[in-house]
Amino acid sequence: MGISQSQIKDLIGDKENIVIFEVGCADGRDSKTFLNTFGDNLKLYTFDPEPVNARLVTTLGSEDAFGGSNDQLITDERHKFTHCALCDYTGTIVFNRSRTVDGPGNGYEWGRYSGSIRRPVTYTESPKYGKRWPQSVFEETVEVDCTTIDDFCKKNNIDHIDFLWMDTQGAEREVLTGAKKMLKNISFIYTEYYDEEMYENCAGLSEIKEILSEFELTNDWRYGDADGGDALFKKIVP
């Protein structure tokens, strides 16, 4: 991702209460950086559908991929994790798990970062790039809970999101569509995107810009190994 938590803090500025959504928090490394960058006025909501990630961010004694303790994610009252996928409806959805061939934990300890509610397409083999990540495979699906940002915010009495961070592996359309009511109350949105079909029928940057018609694209960090990047959008204030 192309932006740091300290830069996000500068963007948000001084506020009495700060709400950040991290959609696709993986093993919690970025989540811990958010907690250590912001003060007591932060409320951090994180989401991830991958079962291994959910275990690692909710179990005392667990570690992230680099051996850092995850205990802060459990003990810090500013953090709330929800084991689910965010999409455009509330219920259940099929999640395509990723793993690394010959990795520990049947490969899920290393390769769990590319799973998606969408089926991988050019991720596994691209006409342009070939097999970029041959050790990464998608061989298992699991049914997981899902909800929308709108439903989650209504249930948890959240009326504003200062920063929406999305690392959703091709599910950008679904996440943003599920936030139709809340979009007017979100200050910044930071999302990855793909202009190749990395995942089946995933939204490219042009479609994301159409969905976020009331936002300005302020930054676009392009990837070197894929047709895509990370984009930062700022709410247009009349």
Regions found by a protein language model. Name each.
Residues 1-238:
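Phosphate/nucleotide-binding beta-alpha loop and adjacent structural elements of enzyme active sites
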